Amino acid sequence: MDRTTQAVTEELTSGRVQRAAAMARKYMPGKPSDAFTNAADSFHDAMADYGEDVKGDFSAQGRLEEIPISLEAPIRKVKEAAAALVQLINADDEIIDPDENAERARVKGAVQEIATTAGKLLKMGNEHVLWYEPTFSTLHLAPLSVSHVLRSNLLTQNPVIATSATLTVGNNFDAMARSIGFVVGSDADEEIKPGEIDPANLQMLDVGSPFDFANQGV
């Protein structure tokens, strides 16, 4: 679960944005890449100012309820400039040289990642948690639950055997199964696409424990 959460956690730093902007400017010089560079520089300045403002304020260095006001506009400009640049790169379909195609894919991937992350930060809902990490001046966005990620990318695609040393809750594993992404009980009304495995087709088995909890429990 922790590894899945880490894998889907979004991170945005000014350094990453500026590196993507530098790649784009080298690959596709012009006003669109200049706009992205300017947006990246503005975001860098805004993050630096925010970092200075929250020094010593530990309440602003951990979890945030929303994007800080001073960062919202710079992030929006980054997202819009990056998205516009991705559209231009997609429209550049005349490249036939394999090396140039590879370079385009690399630049597009870097810029698209920035656009996607910035967009998710701006649309953050109650199902996500946002926090600021001051050491590397980083914004992190992570889902509170990864059950939907595991369900759509794993449980509906492959048969899964899940094992856990976790004790049952209420004499069953329903809570644990739901946290992994299985569909349990009254939840089993989701539409399954053709070719997918039904995540409600679940068998649970408690094999007991070799420990005598009454005498060996701490």
Predicted regions and their residues:
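Conserved coupling segment at the C-terminus of the helicase ATP-binding
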Residues: 1-218
